[in-house]
Amino acid sequence: MSIENLKNALPEYAKDLKLNLGSLANEDVLNQQQKAGTFIASALASRSNLVTSAILAEFGPQLSAEALAAAKAAAAIMGMNNVYYRFVHLVGGDYANLPARLRMNVMAKPGVDKVDFELWSLAVSAINGCGMCMESHEKIVRQNGLTQEQVQAAIRIAATVHAVAATLDGEAALS
């Protein structure tokens, strides 16, 4: 399966998603590794077998083995961190002063350019709705030279991939 197959699988009422998916696959404000990794990390965060398979088939070959592992790691570690830090942020109190005591070594040595890993972490954090994580990752990527347009492109990819996954999974449940 490919991006084209995903587009063709979308129902007529999701035509905007189809158009967005096509234009984002050709987005040129991000470099190839940034774009491919954002698509893959977002697909994994969206938890759809169909979407993840199609996006991995389309974008996996564009990444080195190390970059592919890092995109997967961004989705995995943010799956944990987004829950933990969203709790800390929303509940408040003294939780922020306690050590997390969760291993996060991959964040220090992701195996790719740190800014790319942070961008993928930002996209996943947007999908998972962790404000504290989004603020932190956005600050890091901006301090390391990414533009607002590049950040926005990654979030547009995350939003569209997530919506495609929800739509296709919903349609599958209805059939």
Swiss-Prot record:
GO molecular function, one term: disulfide oxidoreductase activity
Disulfide bonds listed in the record: 130-133
Superkingdom as given in the UniProt entry: Bacteria
Catalytic site positions: 130 (proton donor), 133 (cysteine sulfenic acid (-soh) intermediate)
Gene Ontology biological process: cell redox homeostasis; response to oxidative stress
InterPro entries: AhpD (IPR004674), AhpD-like (IPR029032), AhpD_core (IPR004675), CMD-like (IPR003779)
Catalysis: reaction(s): N(6)-[(R)-dihydrolipoyl]-L-lysyl-[lipoyl-carrier protein] + a hydroperoxide = N(6)-[(R)-lipoyl]-L-lysyl-[lipoyl-carrier protein] + an alcohol + H2O
Keyword flag ATP-binding: no
UniProt similarity note: Belongs to the AhpD family.
Free-text function comment from the UniProt entry: Antioxidant protein with alkyl hydroperoxidase activity. Required for the reduction of the AhpC active site cysteine residues and for the regeneration of the AhpC enzyme activity.
Name used for this protein in its record: Alkyl hydroperoxide reductase AhpD
Gene that specifies this protein: ahpD
